[in-house]
Design a protein with these regions (language model features):
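Basic, polyanion-binding surface patches
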Residues: 1-185
């Protein structure tokens, strides 16, 4: 038996992406965006309303960063999603965030968030879909495995459950991609 819910925007997991930009004065801005992910090879997409300060900044600078919210930074990352830079221009600092300028794009890397995807704007359509070219991915060494790869367990990213409005941690590994299915004959 199944229960029908009708049309809902429920996909699991939904990464909690923290979008970083600079304004026209070179000051950092940041917002929380749960609707985003990979768009194509070396491309990301994130849904942003046109009235966001972040949207204005991306259109002006042509660049942005996406960082993954973590369990350790859940309060700060939630804060930048519930407060608008149009109303609280210094919300980046109020969240306790610090930044360094990306070496690859005109956007900030948030020091407190361990993994960042650095992007140049490809296009921003009238529906609020922002598509960016991935120019670089950087990560703090403490979240790398012994093989030098990003370790999801060490990253400890949170995901957003839009049906309950809860942030969740990822669980344990369930299997190896492109390998588990080979067991079926």
């Amino acid at each position: 038996m199944r229960k029908n819910f009708g049309p809902k925007s429920w996909l699991y997991p939904m990464p909690v992406l923290i979008v970083g930009t600079y304004n026209e004065k070179g000051e950092p801005n940041v917002m929380n965006a749960a609707w985003g992910g990979i768009y194509d090879t070396n491309q990301v997409m994130v849904c942003l309303a046109h009235e966001h300060k972040t949207t204005e900044n991306i259109k002006k600078t042509g660049a942005f960063t996406l960082s993954f919210a973590t369990a350790e930074t859940v309060a700060e990352c939630d804060y930048v999603g519930i407060v608008s830079a149009n109303d609280v221009p210094d919300k980046f600092a109020r969240a306790g965030f610090h930044h360094v300028k990306s070496n690859f794009v005109n956007a900030p890397i948030i020091a407190e968030l361990p993994m960042t995807v650095e992007c140049n704007l490809i296009k921003f359509n009238e529906d609020g879909i922002c598509i960016g070219e991935i120019v670089n991915v950087c990560a703090k060494e403490e979240i790398l495995s012994e093989k030098g790869q990003i370790d999801a367990k060490k990253l400890d990213p949170i995901t957003y459950d839009s049906s309950t409005h809860i942030y969740w941690r990822l669980g344990d590994a369930a299997g190896k991609a492109f390998s588990e299915g080979k067991k079926i004959k």
